[in-house]
Amino acid sequence: LEAAVGADHLVLDVSCRRKGDDYYIAVSTFEWMPGIPVYHSKDMKNWELYTHVLTDDEEVDLKKLPSAKGIWAPCLTYCEQEDLFYVVYGVMNSMNARYFDVDNFVIIAKDIRGPWSKPVYLHSAGFDASMLHDDDGRKWVVSLEWETREGYEKPGAICMVEYSPEKKEVIGYPKRIWNGGTDRGCIEAPHLTKRNGYYYIMCAEGGTGYNHCVTMGRAKNVWGPYEGDPTNPIVTSVPGVSYERQDPDHLKPKYYNPESVLQKSGHGSYVETPLGEVYLVHLCARPFAPELRCTLGRETAIQKMKWTEEGWLRMYDDDNLAKEY
């Protein structure tokens, strides 16, 4: 996607959504303003910078935040019942002493070009928050659970809480619903969708380094229990089984796969075209060996996918190794 929008654009942590024949992606901007750029496309090949969600310092104050903090992983959704766009985003204030101090907000607009509502505070329960608009009008917010105690997995589980648009606040406290589809650990970037009576949860696992991957689970009830896809991970740069739940190293260079051009593949979201085609956008990197320096930083790739007869999402070639072309 960087090649499509221009190399001077930072396109990562992509959340992709469709309204009619229009495709939109929203991305992280960290400590930079204007915040949360939105790109637009008609064919998912040619993209242009369309608008920014956050343009006013009164909406979000990033002045004193250090590098790489600020706005993380916005989740762009469109609610058909309300004809409204929603963006859920987190502001990471600090990561000192392994304590992730994040505040999560939601912002709403009739037109994706704005004007956008004032941010509504959701919670500070964990980063990478996202929202599902259910068929019955209820709204669910999922995020990861960050554990600070020694000896506990960090992140630990995916949690969910209901959001009331009438009260403009969450209802109750987040509850754990999913502990991942692999043992790679570092579960994050949850996205809930609904299809054919199933709730699907898509997550990143393995950390943002070389053991990164995309996993899925599903359940008939939004609260679970969720069953993992039997072929998890569904997209990765390093196929195979590994146990890394207690490893604090997110980079994990030992998992570098020389057979793959795209490394660190994970943190994805999918979109379906009006004709039923399915595409997944995900994080990746292209390091130079042997130093494994990623001079272009984290990038975004796109994979063609398909739904199986059993109702699971697969890469179009039935593999799970992320492809460059």
Spans of model-derived segments:
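Carbohydrate-active catalytic/glycan-binding domains of CAZyme proteins
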Residues: 1-325
